[in-house]
A protein has these predicted regions:
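An alpha-helical support segment within catalytic cores of ATP-dependent transferases
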Residues: 21-41, 147-214, 218, 224-227, ...
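Active-site activation/catalytic loop segments of kinase-like enzymes and analogous catalytic loops
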Residues: 246-275, 285-304, 311, 316-324
Length: 338
């Protein structure tokens, strides 16, 4: 057993918890779809260099009253790593009502129908987050998700909202890749081995979970290309749920580090302690490894082999390796553990 696999047994399984607002959102959004819609052909995916439309089938439609909508159908390929559909729809509903995501119209089974934004809206690109205004708006939107449980961080039992663990997710995906006979690049276990002190200390370093979007990719931001002052909206939500907020900060750093932001500034804007930057940086590296494994796994099991997820996965792994080598606070902490 390697040091990487040995850590897996220390990880706590996901549980289902949440707040009152989300419980009510789950009840409302779970009603059957009864409206009549006319749908176009599904949108094409764009996996390289982003992950646009890769977590489901997206189709535009028009209702009987002329209302334009976007249908997201969750496909089998995402079930291994995505939050449960009912958890995603509950959070999407709450975020839409809060004005930080497109409004959910209807939902049932494996489909979510939300409002279709005007054509000027599109997914953001990484280099656009060099714009300080857009970056701060994006971080504010993510922080707003933390408050969707009515501002209370005390978690009560509720239907639908899943609690996630990034450490657990990494090792589950690693095992699934091995079960599928997927060759793992040496950097996967190399990175996990170097992070062993961080993985061993994850329980002691953990913070109370809050509701999070969970994926810091720029493509999960919708921006109005005609008005840079309009706050962006969040999209995606594939790995949303209750989680350690430093995990989400890490996912944001995984996307932004050395590209568009000062790392400590990101934490402060998210309402987190910048003195604990090394924790977010450790999670940033793990987030890169997770999406590298997801990319490899999707390339193996996708029914449509024309969609190349491997390049995206390898891009994330290269970033993870580079960030592990260049995060000063994380490396200082790791050195102190030796």
């Amino acid at each position: 057993m390697t040091s990487a696999t040995a850590t897996q047994s220390t990880v706590v399984d996901n549980t289902v918890t949440g707040g009152g607002l989300l419980r009510e959102a789950a009840r409302i959004v779970s009603r059957p779809i009864t409206s009549t819609w006319q749908w176009t052909v599904p949108r094409a995916c764009d996996i390289t260099p982003s992950w646009i439309g890769g977590d489901g089938e997206f189709t535009e439609g028009v209702g009987a009253n002329g209302q334009r909508a976007l249908r997201r159908r969750f496909t089998d390929e995402v079930t291994m790593y995505a939050s449960p559909v009912e958890s995603i729809t509950a959070v999407m509903q709450a975020a839409g009502e809060a004005g930080i995501a497109p409004r959910v119209i209807e939902s049932a089974d494996d489909e979510v129908i939300s409002e279709l934004l005007p054509e000027a809206w599109r997914p953001a690109k990484l280099d656009e987050l060099r714009d300080t205004r857009l970056l701060l708006h994006a971080l504010d939107a993510r922080r707003s998700v933390h408050e969707l449980d009515l501002g209370s961080r005390a978690l009560t039992c509720a239907r639908s909202v899943v609690q996630r663990s990034l450490v657990r997710d990494v090792f589950v995906m690693r095992e699934r890749c091995l079960e599928e006979g997927i060759f793992l690049p040496r950097n996967v276990d190399g990175i996990l081995g170097e992070l062993k002190p961080f993985l061993d200390a994850a329980g002691a370093l953990a913070h109370d979970p809050v509701l999070c979007h969970g994926d810091g990719a720029a493509s999960n931001l919708l921006i109005d290309s005609t008005d840079p002052d309009t706050p962006p909206l969040l999209t995606g939500w594939t790995v949303c749920g209750l989680r350690d907020p430093y995990e989400e900060a890490g996912s944001v750093l995984s996307e932004l580090h050395l590209c568009a932001a000062d790392d400590a500034q990101v934490l402060r804007r998210l309402g987190l302690d910048s003195q604990k930057l090394f924790i977010a940086q450790g999670f940033a590296v793990l987030d890169g490894v997770l999406w590298a494994l997801i990319g490899l796994w999707r390339s193996k099991i996708n029914s449509d082999k024309s969609i190349d997820c491997t390049k995206y996965g390898m891009w994330r792994l290269v970033k993870a390796r580079y960030q592990l080598d260049t995060f000063p606070e994380l490396n200082e902490w790791l050195e102190a553990q030796r």
